[in-house]
A protein has these predicted regions:
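SF2 helicase catalytic motif II
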Residues: 170, 175-176, 185-220, 297-301
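A contiguous, basic/glycine-rich beta-loop/short-helix subdomain that forms a polymer-engagement track
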Residues: 150-167, 180-181, 261-369, 423-430, ...
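Conserved pre-motif I regulatory segment
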Residues: 1-38
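A substrate-engagement module of RecA-like helicase motors
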Residues: 3-7, 57-170, 178, 224, ...
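Conserved helicase motor "Helicase C" RecA-like lobe of SF1/SF2 P-loop NTPases
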Residues: 398-427
Length: 542
């Protein structure tokens, strides 16, 4: 049977989806293990993931038993998973769809009833003690309690883990996937959704911040740490792991004795949580030290470690899939994209948008240009331009992509209008989006971080404003190094974010949303890089 025959039941494949699925099928059947797919917003990329999962096999009965019985997670006296080899010997099955946000996970599970989703432990409340999330539940100090909760399906987190690891279609964010034990992750298909952000996700996962205040508690002064010597710093990290490990073991003994009387405010509880997380993070860094060149930065407050490149880190995702599909609405310069991720042989597939560009026009300015040096001076003019547009669209909802917290804060301080919903003062995107959805007023979302995973369809956004080019900060040593090596990489990052932002308000074929770009720097960059930008995107410019 052809891959298209496994299109989800209850849905009808659109011509564009049929084309994509047929081309993916052909690529996988002609020797390609990697397919890079560039398909615009509204092309139904989620259905590609579900079609692949439908095409895959079910989990073997033995693998299912190993997961459901908890045997897959039992460790021996040395701390190694005792049944890891048995799990790894089971055949690959099913598909994992990996996303960048929890809201994108929710979109999958809302669309497909048989999809299962697993999120981090802090998203689940402990059923034994509701005062805690699962990431610090009583079972951390009581293995018998933990096993009881798992085997009796008491804990929502462990139920979600069980179901997601045995289901044909599991949906996880990249962070969750990377934190799972290796022996339970083998699949027929790994689908990397929003793959244009995969480099960022890998850098985030393998970066570390070591705060001097914490290091001081462990007996280290800044002068004791060899940040200028790469080899000696690696040796020092090994010493740090040993010291933190001893602290964790000592705290376990203390907390196991006073668990009933401990609270989240308890100093020992806080230290345990801090050191446990720090230990896991540093171990991840040292385990991958040889695979990537780390950029080490030090300031008065902390030491930051970031991998310069991710071409050798992508294996922590790719090695678990027999076939890999990477898909995004914004694959800019696919050859460079593949090189960054260490992909040598792949099939590139791109389809045009079926949306009418007249329904989603983009208007730009040319002479008003923002940069780090002139931003403060030009903020008043930027605010005035934003207000003019918002007043013109006074009866409809919209969104303002600010790019920086500085711009967001300035607008909040200088606009006294309840119509504007700011992501500031501890607010998160999910909170202001919910208010936006529930309000009958023509509210406007104002946030620096709604580029991805936000579905503002129909009346939720009839206009949107891009306030500033989202160039990455050159004060970051990693970014500065890569910029010097490859200026095109730097420009591509900004253009990728731009295209994603411009797609937040146009979600269906008949949807309408006008976009205003207020930074002439963006206009210049689009003109310079027009040849490598998607045609459907360029058609929107007026």
């Amino acid at each position: 049977m052809a891959l298209i025959d496994f299109f989800p039941n209850g849905f009808t494949a659109q011509p564009q989806q049929e084309e994509l699925i047929d081309r993916i099928d052909d690529a996988f059947n002609t020797g390609y293990d990697f397919v890079i797919c560039c398909a615009p917003t509204g092309s139904g990329k989620s259905f590609l993931s579900k079609t692949l999962s439908n095409h895959s096999k079910e989990a073997s009965s033995n693998f299912t038993r190993l997961i459901e019985s908890y045997n897959a997670f039992r460790v021996d006296q040395f701390g190694a998973y005792s049944r890891a080899e048995e799990c790894e010997n089971e055949p690959a099955f099913g598909a994992f769809a990996l996303t960048i946000t929890k809201s994108l996970q929710d979109q999958y599970t809302n669309l497909f009833n048989d999809a299962t989703s697993l999120k981090g432990k802090n998203n689940y409340i402990c059923k034994v003690d509701p005062n805690y999330n699962v990431d610090f539940a009583p079972c951390h100090f009581n293995n018998k309690l933990k096993e009881s909760c798992i085997l009796n399906s008491t804990c929502d987190y462990y139920c979600a883990r069980r179901d997601t690891l045995t289901n044909k279609f599991g949906v996880l964010n990249y962070s969750m996937f990377l934190s799972l034990p290796e022996h339970v992750k083998k699949r027929e298909y790994i689908i990397c959704d929003e793959a244009s952000e995969l480099e960022t996700e890998l850098v985030k996962r393998f970066s570390r911040n070591l705060n001097y205040k914490i290091l001081k508690r462990l007996g280290y002064r800044p002068s004791d740490i060899p940040v200028e010597n790469y080899t000696k710093f690696r040796v020092w990290l090994g010493e740090l792991i040993f010291k933190i490990g001893n602290e964790v073991e000592d705290l376990k003994k203390v907390l196991s004795k006073k668990r009933k009387n401990a609270s989240t405010a308890d100093t020992d509880v806080q230290r345990f949580r801090l050191y446990t997380n720090l230990l896991a993070q540093i171990k991840t860094t040292t385990d991958n030290w040889e695979d990537c060149e780390y950029v080490i930065e030090s300031n008065l407050e902390s030491i930051t470690l970031k991998p310069l490149r991710v071409n050798n880190l992508s294996k922590h995702i790719f090695k678990f899939g027999k076939k890999i599909l990477l898909m995004s609405a914004t694959i800019i310069d696919h050859a460079n994209f593949a090189k960054i991720l260490g992909i040598k042989k792949y099939k590139y597939i791109e389809v045009d948008s079926t949306f009418d560009p007249k329904n989603a026009p983009i208007y730009v300015v040319k002479d008003f240009k923002l940069n780090h040096k002139n931003l403060k001076e030009k903020l008043p003019t930027l605010k005035d331009n934003i207000l003019k547009i918002c007043n013109f669209h006074k009866n409809v909802k919209g969104v303002i992509h600010t790019h920086t917290m500085e711009i967001t804060q300035y607008l909040k301080d200088n606009i006294d209008d309840p119509r504007f919903l700011f992501r500031i003062d501890g607010a998160v995107n999910e909170q202001i989006i919910q208010r936006h959805i529930e309000s009958k007023e023509p509210t406007i979302l104002v946030s620096p971080s709604m580029t991805y995973g936000v579905d503002l369809k129909e009346d939720l956004a009839r206009f949107q404003i891009i306030a500033k080019a989202s160039f990455m900060p050159l004060g970051d040593e990693r970014i500065k190094k890569l910029f010097k090596e490859d200026p095109d990489w730097y420009a591509n990052q900004m253009l990728n974010h731009l295209i994603q932002a411009c797609g937040r308000g146009v979600r269906t074929k008949n949807d309408k949303c006008v976009t205003y770009i207020l930074d002439g720097t963006i206009t210049d960059s689009v003109i310079r890089n027009a040849k490598k930008l998607p045609k459907y995107f360029l058609k929107r410019f007026n």
